């Protein structure tokens, strides 16, 4: 029987990417979609595959939401906080798929990344779990790249440095970054075109403008263009940022590990638009040849791509500009470190809006509609 699927937050950045992927994979032919809105209910809905969905339902109408077999939401944490418990208290037994982080660590939820933890997902469905939540973007991208090493239980611990895109903070942040870039360029455009000023004088002008009170920093609080921000999310009592705390907590929940795999590091915001990059130092449980490591990683899933550790391959294939908008998960800079034969270096890049956000939700929907 075709399931009725409610879609909430489909106009936003993650929701828009989700809808595009669903159209590309012809997912709408397998469901009866109902589109909801928090602010424009009653207005015309979208046109999907030449089918017009005329009326947007009220995303706060519990009675209508209760009619859904599945609800998939990219509306954000505030919506989840208000609606999810109310729905459950009103007896709704449907499946809830969520991009927001609120429910990730709840005992009655599963963090979804089926190429990595399909067995965990399948087991949870059989046990009656009905809440499925997308993971933190960097963690999902890490697991997609290193999934083979986790699957073969080779990882003792990981130290990670992230280089996270503006998209992870939201659409307004992306716009602010581009505005910052534009202001900095315009301030020295004439100097660059004429070539009459030294680069140091140009740099000095750029720096002064980025420090001025009129520079747009409403969203990031500080300049990101021509800079970086070595803190993401809130502050924890142990000195970690919450983004750094998620690394170990969410990874172990996703994998369903009995013994905790230690993961820690520093999360940094950079001027990339929508691709996160990560640098890993991995302590292996035993010495494994680099050739075998590459084979283990390569064989885990069809999206991961082992990049040869050469200058040319790295520059061409292991950058945000080469990965943005694709499902590819390149991993490179693979080499043993001077610390010993069990110490491995790796670097990976992935699209924050695809495998980092929308794609696990889409794939979870397909798992549920096939039940």
UniProtKB/Swiss-Prot annotation:
It catalyses: L-aspartate 4-semialdehyde + phosphate + NADP(+) = 4-phospho-L-aspartate + NADPH + H(+). GO terms for molecular function: aspartate-semialdehyde dehydrogenase activity; NAD binding; NADP binding; protein dimerization activity. Pathway: Amino-acid biosynthesis; L-lysine biosynthesis via DAP pathway; (S)-tetrahydrodipicolinate from L-aspartate: step 2/4; Amino-acid biosynthesis; L-methionine biosynthesis via de novo pathway; L-homoserine from L-aspartate: step 2/3; Amino-acid biosynthesis; L-threonine biosynthesis; L-threonine from L-aspartate: step 2/5. It holds the Pfam family Semialdhyde_dhC. GO terms for biological process: 'de novo' L-methionine biosynthetic process; diaminopimelate biosynthetic process; isoleucine biosynthetic process; lysine biosynthetic process via diaminopimelate; threonine biosynthetic process. Coiled coil: none annotated. The active site is at 137 (acyl-thioester intermediate), 276 (proton acceptor). Substrate binds at residues 164, 243, 269. NADP(+) binds at residues 11-14, 38-39, 75, 167-168, 352. CDD domains: ASADH_C_bac_like, VcASADH1_like_N. Its EC number is 1.2.1.11. Disulfide bonds: none annotated. SMART domains: Semialdhyde_dh (SM00859). Keywords: Amino-acid biosynthesis, Diaminopimelate biosynthesis, Lysine biosynthesis, Methionine biosynthesis, NADP, Oxidoreductase, Threonine biosynthesis. Phosphate binds at residues 104, 246. Belongs to the aspartate-semialdehyde dehydrogenase family. Homodimer. Catalyzes the NADPH-dependent formation of L-aspartate-semialdehyde (L-ASA) by the reductive dephosphorylation of L-aspartyl-4-phosphate. This is Aspartate-semialdehyde dehydrogenase. It comes from Buchnera aphidicola subsp. Acyrthosiphon pisum (strain APS). The gene is asd.
């Amino acid at each position: 029987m075709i399931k009725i699927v409610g879609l909430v937050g489909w106009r936003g950045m993650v929701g828009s990417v989700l809808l595009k992927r669903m159209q590309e994979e012809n997912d709408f032919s397998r469901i009866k979609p109902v589109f909801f809105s928090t602010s424009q209910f009653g207005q015309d809905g979208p046109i999907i595959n030449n089918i017009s969905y005329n009326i947007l339902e009220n995303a706060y109408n519990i009675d209508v939401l209760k009619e859904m077999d599945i609800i998939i939401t990219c509306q954000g944490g505030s919506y989840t906080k208000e609606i999810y418990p109310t729905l459950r208290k009103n007896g709704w037994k449907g499946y809830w798929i969520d991009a927001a982080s609120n429910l990730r660590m709840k005992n009655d939820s599963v963090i979804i990344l089926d190429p990595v933890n399909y067995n965990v997902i399948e087991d949870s469905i059989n046990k009656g779990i009905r809440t499925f939540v997308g993971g933190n973007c960097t963690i999902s991208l890490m697991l997609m790249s290193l999934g083979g090493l986790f699957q073969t239980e080779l990882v003792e611990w990981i130290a990670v440095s992230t280089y996270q895109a503006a998209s992870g903070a939201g659409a307004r942040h992306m716009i602010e970054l581009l505005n910052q870039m534009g202001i900095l360029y315009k301030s020295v455009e004439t100097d660059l075109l004429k070539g009459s000023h030294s680069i140091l004088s140009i740099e000095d002008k750029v720096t002064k403008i980025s420090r001025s009170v009129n520079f747009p920093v409403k969203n990031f609080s500080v300049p990101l263009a021509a800079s970086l921000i070595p803190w993401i999310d809130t502050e924890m009592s142990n000195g970690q940022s919450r983004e750094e705390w998620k690394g170990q907590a969410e990874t172990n929940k996703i994998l369903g590990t009995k013994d905790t795999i230690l993961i820690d590091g520093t999360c940094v915001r950079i001027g990339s638009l929508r691709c996160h990059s990560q640098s890993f130092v991995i302590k292996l449980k035993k010495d494994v040849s680099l050739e075998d490591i590459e084979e283990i990683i390569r064989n885990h899933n069809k999206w991961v791509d082992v990049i040869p550790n050469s200058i040319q391959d790295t520059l061409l294939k292991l950058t945000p500009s080469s990965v943005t908008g694709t499902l590819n998960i390149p991993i490179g800079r693979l080499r043993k470190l001077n610390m010993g034969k069990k110490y491995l270096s790796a670097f990976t890049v992935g699209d924050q809006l695809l495998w980092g956000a929308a794609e696990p939700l889409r794939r979870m929907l397909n798992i549920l509609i096939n039940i």
